[in-house]
Amino acid sequence: MTALWRDPAKKETGYPAKWTYDHGLVLKGIERVWEKSRDKRYFDFIQRNMDHFVADDGSIRTYTIDEYNIDHILPGRALLFLYKTTRQEKYKKAAALLREQLETHPRTSQGGFWHKKIYPSQMWLDGLYMGEPFYAEYAATFNEPAAFDDIAKQFVLMERNSRDDKTGLLYHGWDESRQQRWANPQTGRSPNFWGRAMGWFAMALVDTIDHFPKQHPKRAKLIAILDRLAHAVTKYQDPQSGLWYQVMDKGTAKGNYLESSAACMFVYALAKGVRNGYLPSRYKAVAKKGYNGILKEFIKRDSNGQLNLEGTVNVGGLGGNPYRDGSYEYYLSEKVVTNDPKGVGALLLAATEMEIASKRR
């Protein structure tokens, strides 16, 4: 595991000095491996990673609340895991600090969280995974029933403002102000359907529904959003490889390529959705086909015998400096790398779900 993610106990050069979302995704994947294996090394790895950042008073090294970056909420899921497992107060205090951010985080006029303070009036698909599973788990753990209406609202707004009626796919971002160059002046939507952005949204749904009270009136809305998403994702699955393209609706257009992190995210969301009864059983075959494609196309053994995950786009965003215009050409311009944490974390989640599925025949 340390070949793919730095171990803080070893003080290795290159260990992330900042509290980051990809860090949180990898740890969530390792948590699922620990739950399956109960190998203490995985638990210790998660705890060492969090202790690298969290002080005894619950403060988080390098985290500043007034950046209002929704990405910074995601690693808090490891804090909730550690608190529930160890009952150490420092993890509860640190999680409460992240929960406090959500109280004052800037919002659109409709009540949707901005992606970041530096991206005003914008909601991105990515942000739903960054914030809502933590928000829902925190609310369930510490008895905040009123929070669930707000959590459901984030998904309803994101789908309403980004879903394309023709394809069923969701545009990467939405700008309420229509001020960004990437935003459609009529709708505020960005121009393309990015695979990993939809993967983040899919994972956000299944992980959030897990914590929703079964009798909550908005739970059925979230399941309906997931079902619509699963239908669209299935429609754009490549029939030969079982994978999905970087720009989902462009298929074999010049420069487009099959991308690994989105595939891992879709496989996880579909398989888990079926297992937990959120999705019809027919999606199990879609997940299996996708997983077989991942194993065939993206898992490669190097000369040292180590398995690697290839084919992950390094990053994707909108606006900023240098400016990302959301064009087809932009999404194809980002580097494709090996063992990117966003791919590795999603692969661990997908693999554990598919292992569970294989034993439930």
Predicted regions and their residues:
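His/Met- and acidic-residue-enriched segments that coordinate or traffic transition-metal cofactors
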Residues: M1-K18, V26-K28, D57-T62, L128-M130, ...
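Long, well-ordered core segments of solenoidal/helical folds
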Residues: M1-K10, D44-R61, K93-G112, P145-R181, ...
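Short linear capping/connector segments at secondary-structure termini
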Residues: F113-Y119, W174-S177, W244-T252
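CBM-like carbohydrate-recognition segments
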Residues: M1-G24, K36-F43, H52-H72, G76, ...
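Inter-helical turn/loop segments and adjacent helix faces that build the functional surface
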Residues: S37, Y138-D149, T208-A220, G273-R282
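Acidic/serine-rich, low-complexity amphipathic helices located in mid- to C-terminal regulatory regions
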Residues: D126-T141
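Oxyanion-binding "anion nests"
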Residues: A202-G251, G255
